[in-house]
């Protein structure tokens, strides 16, 4: 494919040329390039570990580049700190929101640069300026509200407003829709359109292809730290982008279904959670070797089902049976001992210990099995089990002692799944297992799910991605406002039928 650069008449705001960055044993960037124009949304794409975040951290002053040139507004720059980048017109909306939750919205917006009057903070001006920005961006939040009381999407709006307040020319957005509802995503896109109209260049990182093709003008693809291509969205297909990202053609998005569901292994009858609003009278069966999907709109209480089964959400009534034997599952420890495992939705906050090793993260759910009768840890067994996780899950890592936080999202998720497999579960529950994972790593997770189903595991998979549910599962349970709206055979259903069921009890 020939390189296409659209909008030749647009002003070039940023040029990064032949940027290199190495860490011990790893060349993270190898002559990477990026050109961003005014009035445009520029997608930066690549598999996890391709160098996207490293490139932007070199721009934003978090990392110092080893080689290469950065031109911003026609002048060479080499920002030493993120504060310097901000003050010069480059802003970043992080995936993990950097807000002080104990402070008010307006305090967060003007932190470190409060307006002063006679040597004191001018709260009136701060309020008025915040209100003016919010009105321009259609943000309906009280500037005096404590950040701790806001939703994730509202916090994200504050981060964007902060970029706006700095009069940023370049706004970097890293997976901005990962925790947003469909309505919130639409609001975000309207704000992006306003920033674009204002003359900003937006650098947009996302694994969601539909978003890229909806709001972006150009795409730069990185692979293994190298620049692969920059293309116009118009005239480029999804398959071409995927091929450039992974270095090969992905002929199928999903592996073939080679599992055979057998007899019923799990029965859930009239399950109701204690603290409402939550799930009410949820009933279903799961068979050995079956992948049961759970679909529903945001707020449908899909996660509440697996949390109640796993004992981390208290049960008011209902019965859970494994092999026709009733399971109390009063807490997670009891559930684990009974053969249940839960891979949680928010990998970064509840799934991994980012600053600890792969070994620790692999073994933490099964630590009791490494303690001898004398109370000593068996280092040999710990090392062999960690190696089993790395090998069987195909985790790409230099060492079992590597901090898990330094791995890509896909490799982190493989470690989490491997950790649970060490407990030898019969029921594996996966909540948004491919969220924030690139398309190549997603395929590996799908293959893993299929292999586990072939080994007669009962698998429950919650997903907000409809193609994923239709491509991986055998049946789909559809939730609507805490109730089961229907259970459909995947091979016989459609996206339209699932969406109709999802709206049944609204």
From Swiss-Prot:
Chain positions recorded as ATP binding sites: 46-53
Localization of this protein: Cell inner membrane
Catalyses which reaction(s): D-galactose(out) + ATP + H2O = D-galactose(in) + ADP + phosphate + H(+); methyl beta-D-galactoside(out) + ATP + H2O = methyl beta-D-galactoside(in) + ADP + phosphate + H(+)
Membrane topology, from the record: Peripheral membrane protein
EC annotation from Swiss-Prot or TrEMBL: 7.5.2.11
SMART domains, per the entry: AAA (SM00382)
Domain ABC transporter residue range list: 14-249, 260-506
Sample GO molecular function, one term: ATP binding
Xref: InterPro entries: AAA+_ATPase (IPR003593), ABC_carbohydrate_import_ATPase (IPR050107), ABC_transporter-like_ATP-bd (IPR003439), ABC_transporter-like_CS (IPR017871), P-loop_NTPase (IPR027417)
Key words, A-Z: ATP-binding, Cell inner membrane, Cell membrane, Membrane, Nucleotide-binding, Repeat, Sugar transport, Translocase, Transport
Main location per the UniProt record: membrane
A GO cellular-component term linked to this record: plasma membrane
Subunit structure: The complex is composed of one ATP-binding protein (MglA), two transmembrane proteins (MglC) and a solute-binding protein (MglB).
Sequence similarity: Belongs to the ABC transporter superfamily. Galactose/methyl galactoside importer (TC 3.A.1.2.3) family.
Family annotation (PANTHER family): CARBOHYDRATE TRANSPORT ATP-BINDING PROTEIN MG119-RELATED, GALACTOSE_METHYL GALACTOSIDE IMPORT ATP-BINDING PROTEIN MGLA
Function description: Part of the ABC transporter complex MglABC involved in galactose/methyl galactoside import. Responsible for energy coupling to the transport system.
Name the record gives this protein: Galactose/methyl galactoside import ATP-binding protein MglA
Taxonomic classification: Bacteria, Pseudomonadati, Pseudomonadota, Gammaproteobacteria, Pasteurellales
């Amino acid at each position: 494919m020939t390189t296409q650069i659209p909008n030749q008449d647009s002003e070039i705001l940023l040029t990064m040329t032949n940027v290199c960055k190495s860490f011990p044993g790893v060349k993270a960037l190898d002559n990477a390039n990026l050109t961003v124009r005014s009035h445009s949304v520029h997608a930066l794409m690549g598999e996890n570990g391709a160098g996207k975040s490293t490139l932007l951290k070199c721009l934003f002053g978090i990392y110092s580049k080893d080689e290469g040139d950065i031109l911003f507004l026609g002048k060479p720059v080499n920002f030493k700190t993120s504060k310097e980048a901000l003050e010069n017109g480059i802003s970043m909306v992080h995936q993990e929101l950097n807000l002080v939750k104990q402070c008010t919205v307006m305090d967060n917006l003007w932190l470190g640069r409060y307006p002063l009057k006679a040597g004191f903070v001018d709260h009136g001006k701060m309020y008025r300026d915040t209100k003016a920005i919010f009105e321009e961006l259609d943000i309906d939040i009280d500037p005096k509200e404590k950040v701790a009381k806001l939703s994730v999407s509202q916090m994200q709006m504050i981060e964007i407003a902060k970029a706006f307040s700095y009069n940023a020319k370049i706004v970097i957005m890293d997976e901005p829709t990962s925790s947003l509802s469909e309505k919130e995503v639409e609001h975000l896109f309207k704000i992006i359109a306003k920033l674009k109209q204002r003359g900003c260049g937006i650098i947009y990182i996302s694994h969601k292809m539909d978003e890229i093709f909806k709001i972006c003008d150009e795409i730069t693809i990185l692979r293994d730290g190298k620049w692969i291509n920059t293309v116009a969205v118009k005239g480029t297909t999804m398959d071409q982008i995927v091929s450039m990202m992974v270095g090969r053609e992905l002929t199928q998005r999903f592996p073939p279904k080679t599992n055979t569901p057998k007899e019923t292994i799990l029965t859930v009858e009239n399950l109701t959670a204690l603290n409402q609003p939550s799930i009410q009278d949820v009933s279903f069966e799961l068979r050995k070797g079956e992948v049961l999907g759970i679909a529903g709109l945001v707020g449908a209480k899909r996660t509440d089902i697996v949390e109640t089964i796993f004992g981390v959400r208290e049960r008011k009534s209902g019965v859970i049976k494994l092999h026709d034997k009733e399971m109390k599952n009063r807490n997670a420890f009891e559930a684990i001992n009974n053969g249940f495992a839960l891979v949680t939705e928010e990998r970064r906050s509840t799934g991994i210990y980012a600053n600890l090793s792969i070994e620790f993260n692999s073994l933490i759910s099964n630590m009791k099995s490494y303690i001898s009768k004398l109370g000593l840890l068996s280092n040999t067994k710990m090392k062999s089990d960690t190696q089993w996780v790395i090998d069987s899950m195909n985790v790409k890592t230099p060492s079992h002692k590597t901090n898990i936080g330094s791995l890509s999202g896909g490799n982190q998720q493989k470690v989490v799944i491997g950790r649970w497999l060490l407990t030898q579960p019969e029921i594996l529950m996966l909540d948004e297992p491919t969220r924030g994972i690139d398309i190549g790593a997603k395929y590996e997770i799908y293959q893993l799910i299929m292999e586990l189903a072939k080994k007669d595991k009962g698998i429950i998979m919650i997903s907000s991605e409809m193609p994923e549910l239709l491509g991986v599962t055998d049946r789909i349970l559809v939730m609507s406002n805490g109730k089961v709206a229907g259970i459909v055979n995947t091979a016989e259903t459609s996206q339209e039928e699932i969406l109709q069921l999802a709206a049944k009890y609204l």
